[in-house]
A protein has these predicted regions:
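Extended, low-polarity segments enriched in aliphatic/aromatic residues
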Residues: 2-48, 53-63, 69-303
Length: 303
């Protein structure tokens, strides 16, 4: 049987404060059964993507604050949960610049897999590609989770929503690399004749895998996570991605999600998808194109 999905439309037919989608977020959460997800006194992980340096279209802080306030009203102890891309200090600085902090959101922002993405628990998935997933410790130990996902396009899975937010965003760096390697077995290919020696590729790498030698990129294949950020940062096609195997990527993501969700009771997870600012690229990208469809609204479900 299909799960019920509740929708809060983006269009406001009457210009009244009470009709604002921000104001109506608590009603949406109530309709989907948030009171069954939040247990008084228990921590509640509010999982969301904090964006990248240069991006600008993540979920707006005022929406997140409404979710936080609702959890508090129900007696829960909310915290914003995200995993390392750069190290925790750099990522929290990016989050603060974008308006995600204790003052604006009303709860702590926690990098749940530790300073360098090494704090995790191994969980079996039963999958074929990702047999074991490294679930971030802060997710593993949380009794409840509310998944706030910004719906976008994606270069490998075509669509990015709750599955990508959980499968990639709730796991430690080692599992992120494993999933990326499922589609990109080899590191980016470098064409020296096209290189303008601008250095933008090195700035885009969050993993220290790309260094400049005489202003030309040199990739360490051991450190490279195959995220392909450097290829998107290169405007001269000097760094290009190898031919991808996208079916493997989507399967690996799904297997990772299965492992993450196995650490929760099924009734203790709620999914909220923001179908607004739907860009062709996901929020990991260092810059984002204009939205490809008009804003639709916010979807909420227990599945």
């Amino acid at each position: 049987m299909c799960a019920k999905v509740y929708m809060l439309g983006a269009q406001v037919l009457r210009v009244e404060g009470a009709r604002s989608p921000v104001v109506r977020i608590p009603d949406l959460l109530d309709a989907a059964g948030i009171s069954e997800v939040v247990v008084p006194g228990d921590p509640v992980a509010i999982k969301m993507h904090l964006g990248s340096d240069g991006g600008s279209r993540t979920i707006r802080p005022e929406f997140v604050r409404k979710v936080v306030d609702k959890v508090k009203l129900l007696g829960g102890r909310p915290f914003i949960a995200e995993t390392c891309r750069p190290d925790a200090i750099q990522y929290l600085e990016i989050a603060n610049q974008r308006g995600y902090n204790d003052s604006t959101l009303g709860c702590p922002v926690v990098i749940v897999d530790g300073f360098k993405g090494n704090d995790f628990r191994d969980v079996l998935t039963g999958g074929q590609i990702v047999k074991t997933v490294q679930v971030a410790a802060g997710i593993f130990h949380a009794p409840s989770m509310i998944v706030l996902s910004h719906v976008t396009g994606h270069g490998d899975s075509s669509y990015a929503g709750a599955i990508k937010n959980i499968g990639m965003g709730c796991v430690a760096r080692s599992s992120k690399g494993k999933i990326h390697r499922s589609v990109n077995v080899d590191p980016p290919i470098f064409h020296p004749d096209r290189c303008a020696a601008c250095g933008e590729c090195a700035k885009a790498c969050n993993y220290g895998a790309l260094t400049l030698v005489q202003q030309k990129p040199v990739i360490n294949p051991v450190l490279c996570e195959r995220c392909m950020r450097c290829t998107r940062a290169c405007t001269h096609a000097a760094l290009v991605r190898p031919a991808p195997t996208r079916e493997n990527f989507m399967q690996a993501l799904a297997e990772s999600v299965k492992g993450v969700l196995s650490t929760f009771e099924p009734s203790r997870v709620l999914f909220v998808n923001f179908v607004v600012d739907v860009t062709p690229q996901c929020d990991c990208a260092p810059s984002l194109d204009i939205p490809i469809v008009p804003d639709q609204g916010v979807l909420c479900s227990r599945d």
